[in-house]
Amino acid sequence: MRVGCCLLLKPLRQRLCTASISSRHIMRWCATSSSNINSTETAAKMPDDDVSGSLSAPSLLKYKIEPSTATMGAPRPPHDDDRAFCTLASFPPSHIRNVAVVAHVDHGKTTLSDAILRRTGVLSGSQVGTYTDRLLVERERGITIKAQTCSIFVVWDGEEFLLNLIDTPGHVDFQYEVSRSLSASDAALLLVDAAQGIEAQTMAHFHMALDRGLTILPVLTKMDAVLSDAPVDRALQDLEDSTGLLRREVLFTSAKEQLGIEALLHAIIERVPPPTGLLGLSDLQQLPPLLPGSAERVAMEEKMVPLRALLFDSWTSECGGGLRRPAPRGGEKVNSGNDNDRNLICLVRIIDGTLTAKTVVTFYQSQRRCEALEVGIIHPELRPTAALTAGMVGYVVFSQVRGEEFLVGETLYTLPTRKFARENIVPVPGFRRVQPVVFAGFYPDEGEYITQLREAVEKLRVNEPAVTMEPLDCPALGSGLQLGFLGMLHMQVFQERLLAEFGQRVLVTPPLVQYKYREAGSDEEEPLKPLTVHTWKWIHEGAACYLEPYVTATIITRREHFQAIDGEALRRFRGEQLDMRVLDDARVLVRYKMPLADLARGFFAVVKSLSHGYASLDYGDPVYEEADLVKVDVLVQKSRISALSVICLRSEAPSIGKRIVSSLKSNLTRTAVDIPLQAMVGSKIVARETVKAYRKDVTAKIHAGDISRKQKKWNDQKKGKERMARRTVGAVTLDQSILAAAMGAISL
């Protein structure tokens, strides 16, 4: 298995170096290697290994960085129209490189990607901001949410290469984006902040790339922010100890200062393996006009190969994150199949064959046949091309395909001639589909219709395939949707995108994790049944036991913050410490076994607060264990409010019920009769409050006399209230503001 240029089994003592390095020297080398960054003729030479005594050369000896003897030519100039791209000749696989950029949160992935785009001429120097963060929510939050692809043309040593760069998110909630991006890549740039070193998501992404057999190029970023040698030495030592990647393989960059970019591009061309695949035409309509049965046509048909392509992302024009075709030069109108808002745009990696417009492809799983209206690359907008050939990453437009009719991860194929059958097609190894871990009900805002919300969610799910959807019906809130997400941040981002891209304001119920139960009399091998407040079964109704999801949470934090985090994890979040390892003089790694419900309830926010933002957290797939669960129902005037039902531990039911009824009491308007508020577990009341009725002062005119005169008035008033309560028909009206306040009490 290839991991960069190192062997993981090589003894560590053979890889350690004894010299010291100054980050000032590294930055001076970066400046030297990029001194001609604006030159369109040649790239600067790196210093030779036999130089000694200079400020730039001795520090490089420690890392064994090979000097670059290649020259970088002028980048392909940007085009104002699509005509040059429509005639783009196919690149041989030997001149294609597919690379994904992965790293922990805020380690400089997007900034480095933008620096590469500017250095290669894809973006102009006047464009400010992070270009690959296209979504409004990405720019507002300052994080990458959707993986973005861009094709780059690089001329090196007189040869033109096509680099497909994929910028990925770093947050744990968006690992599905990273997984899909790695499936379409041949290598991964593993970025590490030189000042912060390896974090939890760094290792998660490293193992994800390692499992796929990808080449890994380690890169230290933000070198301009390093003020001493210690952080660099510590980061390099962490890389060796944790990943086995050699120091001499590490590349140094400063995207902010545009330093080290050429050396990085050279390393991508030299060290990333080219894609493997079969070249050839894949559909009869791709053949030139020849007489049927002619020797030339028969010879060309013999050389045809079936198309195989991996579909790893999709969107519609309404939720494409700003990806559009650029305006043609001179206001010309270019006809394209991408003009219809209902068309589906898919990102594909071509494994074998050729894909062109008008090619009819088949989805391997659903067996649905669709005609490609347009194909092209992203540079940095949608640029139509004549074809996509083996090894290339690009987009394909289909006409009015519903999102639920295909799955991201599908294999697209063709059978060009009769000698090929479906049995000859080997599906492209895609990526493991993930299961949602957090569920919440989405209800339309007052005055909105559920149909509009459902249509908006369906369109957004085309771009968010990890989100699941099921219909809901609540007497208090009306019709809604139960959506499943990969985490709390994923849910919040989805809600913000609904508002920003479709104008849908929604009421979101408290998020719950996926509980399960085992039916009575079932075998251990039988799959567990999902358990929600709508499908709840008591033990006497056929449930043998209930199960709760647990995860292993990995935290990397500074040593001075460990005690505070450990105390909170054990006291408030039912954590169980599995092990603790000292990484270096400043940091420790600790692993906890913790219920997923407690982690989603705010554990990560507490960790960030206690560590002043310096801790990182990662967690794996949930494992289900038995738990004493109950369902808490809330009754308002003896009518059950299903939107406020919640599943929790039996020991927590009284406190949760008390918070809910107290919130209702504080927000409900008093009426002429008492309103009882009850929280029940089965038939047992675990919490109760009463909204007292308004009372008229019936003794206001009685100023003297015996107390019995007042008591008679009070008794008459009490009997009247009882008669009024018996005549009351229907339940108390709860508007969404009252329900939202009560739902907020559940999440405390």
UniProtKB/Swiss-Prot annotation:
Alphabetized Gene3D superfamilies for the sequence: 3.30.70.240, Elongation factor 4, C-terminal domain, Elongation Factor G (Translational Gtpase), domain 3, P-loop containing nucleotide triphosphate hydrolases, Translation factors
Annotated InterPro entries: EF-4, EFG_III/V, EFG_V-like, LepA_C_sf, LepA_CTD, LepA_IV, P-loop_NTPase, Small_GTP-bd
Domain tr-type G positions: 94-276
Lipid bilayer topology: Peripheral membrane protein
Xref: Pfam families: EFG_C (PF00679), GTP_EFTU (PF00009), LepA_C (PF06421)
Residue ranges that the Swiss-Prot or TrEMBL entry lists as coiled coil: none
Keywords associated with the record: GTP-binding, Hydrolase, Membrane, Mitochondrion, Mitochondrion inner membrane, Nucleotide-binding, Protein biosynthesis, Transit peptide
Reaction equations catalysed: GTP + H2O = GDP + phosphate + H(+)
Similarity annotation: Belongs to the TRAFAC class translation factor GTPase superfamily. Classic translation factor GTPase family. LepA subfamily.
The protein, known as: Translation factor GUF1 homolog 2, mitochondrial
Organism of derivation: Trypanosoma cruzi (strain CL Brener)
